[in-house]
UniProtKB/Swiss-Prot annotation:
One of its GO terms (biological process) is mitochondrial electron transport, ubiquinol to cytochrome c. This is Cytochrome b. A ubiquinone binds at residue 201. Heme 1 (or BL or b562) is low-potential and absorbs at about 562 nm, and heme 2 (or BH or b566) is high-potential and absorbs at about 566 nm.
Length: 379
């Protein structure tokens, strides 16, 4: 008799995705981040659901409802901090996952890659709106600054901003709609993640060498299930270390001050995972130019497959491209640091140079490095 997991309509899908899936035998720990992102998403949806049971999306009570969760709800504090720090873990995994894709040439799976970029944008939108919900000073002013960027769009900008706000400033209507969007988007992300997997399983996984591995596949279970479980345990360990020892390490102290439209904080800055994009935004003196650079800093990922000039897929055997990649990583770390600094000398010029370098590395230096390597290999 055939096994039920291979015949049952639902279990067959699970079986083909997580059990009998033919997987390259040599994928490294860099391939763990996909499953970790799935775990992060589930964790965020669950903790978010329990927070939503006690949260009120009204300007008068939002801040105190979060305080109430932390003080009066059973284990509310741990749920709240798991949700806040879970977002940070989510973005760490996201950046690692995208970096892995760039390094090993996984972007040649076009559909998978493009849905991944959409997933990244959707996650960034969700995180931004979630940051507004506690209605602290940084929540309010972050929302004001970022939504105001829409006013840079010619002709329709001002109307668009007021339409997003639901009034003439960030107020009750804005908070309510942000809560609604923040609640619905993770489910859209979950659906998109399934499509992401669907397209990936059409081609099969890439591997560190970038060479087709059809001749050398092993079943996903038990080999990679056990490997993923190790990754999940490490993820939860790091998350719980953050939550239980330094829950506010990655947050902003200003967000413990209730939102006050009459008092602007000295330094408005987003959460750490947006600082690189914020630095690019600030480094251009023109408003529309800054907004375009901000959008392009993420959308440039869509162009990466078309800028691939190498005859090899992975960077494993391409030392010049490896150098470029790690310079890009250093550049992004520099941008992240600059995004958290005040707008004054020398930070302004460092930010501008780092922003120029970011686009230059991806658009010019990496394709040129690949071409040089091709010539060195007499290809």
């Amino acid at each position: 008799m055939t096994n039920i997991r291979k015949t049952h309509p639902l279990m067959k899908i699970v079986n083909n995705a997580f059990i009998d899936l033919p997987t390259p035998s040599n994928i490294s720990s860099w391939w763990n981040f996909g499953s970790l992102l799935g775990i992060c998403l589930i964790l965020q949806i669950l903790t978010g659901l329990f927070l939503a049971m006690h949260y009120t999306s009204d300007t008068m009570t939002a801040f105190s409802s979060v305080t109430h969760i932390c003080r009066d709800v059973n284990y509310g504090w741990i749920i709240r901090y798991m949700h806040a720090n879970g977002a940070s873990m989510f973005f760490i995994c996201l950046f690692m996952h995208v970096g892995r894709g760039l390094y090993y040439g996984s972007y040649t799976f076009l559909e998978t890659w493009n849905i991944g970029v959409i997933l990244l944008l959707a996650t960034m939108a969700t995180a931004f709106m979630g940051y507004v919900l506690p209605w602290g000073q940084m929540s309010f002013w972050g929302a004001t600054v970022i939504t105001n960027l829409l006013s840079a769009i010619p002709y329709i900008g001002t109307n668009l901003v007021e339409w997003v706000w639901g009034g003439f400033s960030v107020d009750k209507a804005t908070l309510t709609r942000f809560f609604a969007f923040h609640f619905i988007l993770p489910f859209i992300i979950a659906a998109l993640a399934m499509v992401h997997l669907l397209f990936l399983h059409e081609t099969g996984s890439n591997n560190p060498t970038g060479i087709p591995s059809d001749t050398d596949k092993i079943p996903f279970h038990p080999y990679y299930t056990i490997k993923d479980i190790l990754g999940v345990m490490l993820l939860i360990l790091v998350l719980m270390l953050l939550v239980l020892f330094t829950p506010d390490l990655l947050g902003d102290p200003d967000n413990y001050i209730p939102a006050n439209p009459l008092n602007t904080p000295p330094h408005i800055k987003p959460e750490w995972y947006f600082l690189f994009a914020y630095a690019i935004l600030r480094s251009i003196p023109n408003k529309l130019g800054g907004v375009l650079a901000l959008v392009l800093s993420i959308l440039i990922l869509v162009l990466v497959p078309f800028l691939h000039t190498s005859k090899q897929r992975s960077m494993m055997f391409r030392p010049i491209s490896q150098c470029m990649f790690w310079i890009l990583v250093a550049d992004l770390l520099t941008l992240t640091w600059i995004g958290g600094q005040p707008v004054e000398h020398p930070y302004i010029i460092i930010g501008q140079l780092a922003s120029i370098m970011y686009f230059l590395i991806i658009l010019v230096m990496m394709p040129v490095a690949s071409t040089i390597e091709n010539n060195l290999l007499k290809w």
